[in-house]
Design a protein with these regions (language model features):
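N-terminal helix-loop segment corresponding to the beta1-alpha1 unit
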Residues: 1-183
């Protein structure tokens, strides 16, 4: 790949929109992105329509330019393979519910000791700390909680979701900006 990130290796442990949008931007900027998906499950968005030749156009648009590997990070053999790739990585991006990667031995506290130059980007709806951190978040939930849905739609109607998943797209964009700023810093 060409581009300003051509020498950067990104491990993509993301699903649906926020994380894949971030890593799509990094790939578009030239990074080599390896998407890690659970075997037989994959990214949830593989099931989102519309479909072209039995493939999700949604999934393909967000994961263009990426390589893909199926690994079960709960399995000891797959963990070894992941760790071999991790040794070469510059960036890891994840958007699991907080605490998930810690359970598998790949949380920030574990990895920063082994890989002090690794940039570890976590995108979650309610952050990594605080009272709501355990809640799953989708764009529509955050639009509602943030009040955005109350100012869209028709007068005297129910709250209406903004047509585009603006919260997820914006969060993915800001995560990509954060990764790029971290690359400059190291």
């Amino acid at each position: 790949m060409n581009g300003p990130l051509k020498d950067i290796l990104v491990l993509d442990l993301t699903r649906v929109l926020v994380g894949p949008y971030c890593t799509m931007i990094l790939s578009d900027l030239g990074a080599r992105v390896i998407k890690v998906e659970a075997p037989e499950i994959g990214d949830d968005s593989r099931k989102f329509g519309p479909f072209i030749d039995d493939q999700s156009a949604y999934f393909m648009s967000l994961n263009r330019g990426k390589e893909s590997i199926a690994l079960n990070l709960k399995n000891s053999e797959d963990k070894k393979i992941f760790e071999q790739i991790l040794k070469k990585a510059d960036v890891l991006v994840e958007n699991f519910k907080p605490g998930t990667l810690e359970k598998w031995g790949f949380g920030w506290k574990d990895l920063c000791k082994k890989y002090p130059k690794l940039i570890y980007a976590s995108a979650s709806g309610f952050g990594q700390t605080g009272p709501l951190r355990e809640l799953p978040a989708y764009d529509m939930v955050v639009q509602g909680m943030g009040g955005l849905m109350s100012v869209t739609g028709q007068p005297n109607s129910e709250p209406t979701r903004v047509g585009t998943s603006i919260g997820d797209i914006t969060a993915g964009l800001f995560t990509a900006i954060g990764v790029n700023l971290s690359l400059i810093h190291i």
